Regions:
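NAD(P)+-binding Rossmann beta1-loop-alpha1 motif at the extreme N-terminus of oxidoreductases
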Residues: 1-62
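Glycine-rich, N-terminal phosphate-binding loop of Rossmann-like dinucleotide-binding domains
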Residues: 70-71, 96, 149
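Internal alpha-helical scaffold of NAD(P)-dependent oxidoreductase catalytic cores
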Residues: 139-230
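Interdomain hinge/lid region at the active-site interface
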Residues: 213-281
Length: 286
């Protein structure tokens, strides 16, 4: 059913998708495109893709499935260009970390009888640093891959079959698939993905202010410090779009954390501190 795949964006996720597909047994053609030529060359050398496309739109036209593996606003831009030129024999999917704006664009540009299908996706997998050189065939193994499909989508029999086939390949890559409403998706990931990132960013920035001129003090913190600040190495270029497209949900989560920290600060010498540790321990056990 799926013989040709175009991966638009050969950074960490795009390259990992190509490698994971090969590891899962995909034998069709995989074409890659990247805004920066070096990323595509690295993906090609790693055998995540078979060829490099000069034009992303042409690569999409010549494929059965197009995977958008670029930041969210770049995804939205590509959707605007692809929607009018792809027919009902095509599937477009993405790996973006927020879904509401992408689903709104998909309803307007895709999922109509004479147009390509669009399946919004979000693999809950990644690393603190990006780039094709860090591509990993096992990145999605054991991870959750979220879908926020529109139950009212109108699809041809062929594009519906492509959707089913892509879901099967995601499972073959080792992921567990879960379907969510896009609004609920964005609320949920604000807590379980975006909040941890912004906590790590704030903590790392604070420590840089406090001890950045004494790098030997970083070693004093040991493993706990390294684990808490690992995500502080994440690139702004990716998280900017997440912050811009999920602002309200992230603000809600950050405000709740601010209030919790204030509560903790005020109870450092009361029995409430034990309650907080017990609640935290319960979360880690369950």
């Amino acid at each position: 059913m799926i013989e040709r795949i175009a991966i638009l964006g050969t950074g960490l996720l795009g390259t990992s998708v190509g490698l994971a597909l090969r590891a899962a047994g995909f034998r069709g053609a995989i074409t890659g495109w990247n805004r920066g030529a070096e990323g595509a060359q690295v993906a090609l050398a790693a055998k995540a893709i078979d060829s490099i496309a000069a034009d992303p739109l042409q690569a999409a036209r010549e494929s059965d499935v197009t995977v958008l593996a670029v930041p969210i606003y770049a995804t939205l831009d590509l959707m605007e260009q692809l929607g009018p030129i792809l027919g009902c024999d095509h599937l477009v999917t993405d790996v973006g970390s927020t879904k509401r704006k992408i689903c709104e664009a998909a309803a307007r540009l895709f999922n109509q009888r004479d147009r390509a299908a669009f399946l919004p996706g979000h693999p809950m997998a990644g690393k603190e640093r990006g780039g094709a050189a860090l591509g990993d065939a096992g990145l999605f193994r054991g991870a959750v891959w979220l879908f926020t499909d529109d139950p009212a989508a109108e699809r041809s029999a062929h594009s519906a079959a492509l959707v089913k086939a892509w879901r099967e390949w995601v499972a073959a890559m080792g992921s567990k698939t879960i379907d969510l409403d896009p609004v609920r998706h964005d609320e949920l990931v604000a807590w379980v993905s975006h909040l941890p990132q912004f906590v790590a960013t704030a903590l790392s920035a604070l420590l840089q202010d406090e001890v950045g001129d004494a790098p030997e003090l970083k070693d004093v913190g040991g493993r706990g410090l390294r684990e808490m600040t690992r995500l502080g190495a994440s690139p702004f270029s990716m998280w900017r779009d997440i912050a811009y497209t999920n602002t309200e949900a992230v603000q809600t989560a950050l405000l709740a954390l601010e209030q919790r920290l204030a509560h903790l600060r005020e109870n450092l010498r009361t029995p409430v501190l034990r309650d907080e540790f017990e609640q935290a321990n319960r979360f880690r056990r369950e």
